[in-house]
Structure formats: structure tokens, C-alpha cells
């Protein structure tokens, strides 16, 4: 079990009623426990499922739902109707529920026992009946949920539950995320800005400004011994490559990057933050030409890269939405093999049906997506208030399918946009000393890039090789977000119509609740 999931639980609640007698309820109880044990033993669902009993009345339903709200370990509820469970008894409980809901339409037995089946068997095994009744009341009440249909022992059904469970963990974590902005948004940039109050109300993330000058108190307390130890870690984890900067400048800048990382880690820990942003125009007020200068000589790119690999959300140029979304993505895909990163659309390569977009940034791309051991290099970065030589990890990404996602503020709502991409191998770029990925947007460059632009997408995104569109669909469902999906089946005319339809729906949506 991934560390991020160790103390989490999913509660399984079975629906029934007392119409069929107490012995029937005992059988339902036994079957339910066996099914929960089977899911836990499968090794597919990464979060422990806990059987919380069979509910037979409105009071019992309401009690377990309220208990789930008040238990921090519980990140979601799975419901299943073994017998018929009249849905009016679920109303108060569903009204009270504040955790994600998965409705599992399954059955204890896989097949009908044709030769022995009688009415007792029919009354006991009424999922076909009870789940439809439960589904109706959820739809009538506009309850957001995921519906999984299939036999509980099959890998296909278990995988869908696993997707939902991972996303529920990400949503639970989102409500505990504090994102620190070291400096504000880059001036005059629209897409990285937005309503931070509504963002917290809708998605749970809390975003605060934190002065770079306050971080300098931490900076000054970092010892040379601590810097030496971290530099030794760099030597073990990365390939040391000294280029035009020369050895003296190289190690000076690497040590400065190490000091920045130590200070930044301590601020985040003391402030209880799991995401942050930087801005190259706000690096503190110290004079870099002062012989006794102490502070950021450039943006803390190496620190950002390493912190992302450990699950700290990051957004460049004050992009707090992407910083928070990256944190959630990292939580969701804990234990998966291939990696995730903050990325930015940088430059295009027109090559017919393999036209692509180079993803990079000035410094901050996560080494989790590196195809080979990253190189630790020092080069000049001529942007922002301090144009200096600075340390960074340089690598190219793995090849393979992936998905990028972003959240944008449209004024009256937040929109989640996801897009399938194919990462391909770039040609050598000997004069570009930054980490990068090269991808072909799906379904084609022309349609995929056009769809992203029409949807109002950002130039920053949270990217993953390991998750799929289904994860982001569940995320949007849990948080009540609009989700625009761009994939192999996307066409521009249909996308335009969907966007127009969504404008109307989301204006009227609040009246339905």
C-alpha cells in the first residue's frame, strides 16, 4: 500500500430491509463481509475497504453517513443493495453525506442456480431490483456518484473501484492542501489567475501569499554542513556535468541551490503546506551585487524539481491552480510506475501527421518522468529580476501515452480539461539545457491543439503517464466540475456544440439542487 494511502479507509455499506426476516439479514451480512474481504485480498484496490454493516432503516442509513462525514480516515462510501432496499429510507442519509459515493451494481453469486432457485433465493439476491431503486433516488436527488456494474470478483470491476478510490484519496487530500505563493502571479497573465475563494469553496484547496523576505529567515539558519550533505546527495542521484560555467561557478551555484532547497523545505513544513508557486520577478529584496548577498540568485528550480518528485505541488509564475492540481495528481497515482510532472507548452514542431508540441520550462520539470538518470547542470537563465547562472536537472522524458489536465476559471465556474497525448522521442537538442517532453496531442495535432484552445486551456498542465481520462472524470464528478475531454474520438464540431451546451447547463445547474 502506498504511503499516502496508509491511514485511509473506504466504507462499504450494504442495503437491505427487514421484510424478509432476521435470518436473511444475517446471510446478507456474511456475504457482504466475504465480498469486502475479497476486494481487499485482490491487491488491486490500493485503499482498505471496511465493511460498516447492513442498513435496514432510514435511521441506520443516516447514522452511518453522518459517521463517515466525521471520520477523517473515511474518504468515500461504497453502497450495494443485496436485497430490495426501499429508496425513501436512503433520502436523509444521502442528504447528509459529504463524502464521495460509489454505487456498486453487483451480486454475491455470479450465476443463477437454475435447477435449485426458489423464491427464497430470489428475495435474498435482489441486486437487480434493489440497485435500480437506489439508483433512481440518487438521480432524483442529483447525487453525484460513480456507478460500477460487474461481478465483484472480476478484475475489470475491481479496477474501476480502484480508480475511484485513488481519486477519492486525492479529493480528501485536496481539502487539506495549503498552497504558498512565493510572490504573486506573473503580471498581466490571465489564465494563471482566478478566484481563490471560490477555488477553496469548490475544490478544497487553500492558497496563501507568503513573502520571499520571510523565507530569508530560514535561509540564514541553513548551515554549511547541511548544504554539504545535500550536495553529496546530488552527487549520488544525478550525473554531474560541468559545462561553460566552470567548476568554481558550478559548485557555487549548486550549493546555493541546495541552500534554497533546505530553506524552502523548512518553510513548507512549518507552514503545513504541500504546494507552492514561485515568480521570477519576486525573489526577495536583497541586492545580488552586494558582496555579502544571501538569497535566491534565481528561481529555485532544482528545489522545485526535487520537491515535485516527493509530491509537493508546484506551479510556475504564481500558477496556484496547477500547483494544487499537480499535488492531487501525485496523490492519486501513488505507487504507479511511470511518473508525473508540471509541464508547459513551449514550441511547436510541424511534421505532418506527427506534428507535436515541446513541453518544457525554464527549470522546473519533475525528474519522475525522466527516461535516463538526470544530469545536474548549471547554465545562464536570462529572465526575471536576477539573470544568473543557476542549477537545474536536465533530461528528456519517457515515451508513451499520457494525459495532461488543467483547471481554468471561467468566471461563473471552474472547468477541468483533460487531453490524451502521445509522448515521442525528440531529436537531440544540444543547446537547450532544460528538461523536456515532446508530445503529439490526440486525436491529431490540428484537432487536439484546436480543441484545447477552444476549451480555454492553459499553457501549464499537470501531466501523467499512469492515469487515464477515467480518473479525471471521477475527479470532476466528485467536485461538481465541468469536464471537457479531448481524446481520440474528439471532433471540433462536436466539441463546439458540447461547449455551447455546457454554458447553458452550468448556468441552470444551481437551480436543480
What are these regions (language model features)?
Residues 4-27, 176-185:
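Short beta-strand segments enriched in small/hydrophobic residues
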Residues 82, 99, 105, 113-117, ...:
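Anaerobic metallocofactor- and corrinoid-dependent redox/one-carbon enzyme cores
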